[in-house]
From Swiss-Prot:
Alphabetical UniProt keywords: Chloroplast, Electron transport, Membrane, Photosynthesis, Plastid, Thylakoid, Transmembrane, Transmembrane helix, Transport
Molecular function in Gene Ontology: electron transporter, transferring electrons within cytochrome b6/f complex of photosystem II activity
Origin superkingdom: Eukaryota
Organism: Jasminum nudiflorum
Family: Belongs to the PetL family.
Compartments where found: Plastid, Chloroplast thylakoid membrane
GO cellular component assignments: chloroplast thylakoid membrane; cytochrome b6f complex
InterPro entries, A to Z: Cyt_b6/f_cplx_su6
Full protein name: Cytochrome b6-f complex subunit 6
HAMAP family: Cytb6_f_PetL
Length: 31
């Protein structure tokens, strides 16, 4: 259970960082 929870937590962090970087690049390109 702990391994699955930590895995999903890590996956959530990666998705959040990727989304933040993608949005940042999009804003830079729009400006």
């Amino acid at each position: 259970m702990l391994t699955i929870t930590s895995y999903f937590g890590f996956l959530l962090v990666v998705l959040t960082i990727t989304s933040a970087l993608f949005i940042g690049l999009s804003k830079i390109r729009l400006i």
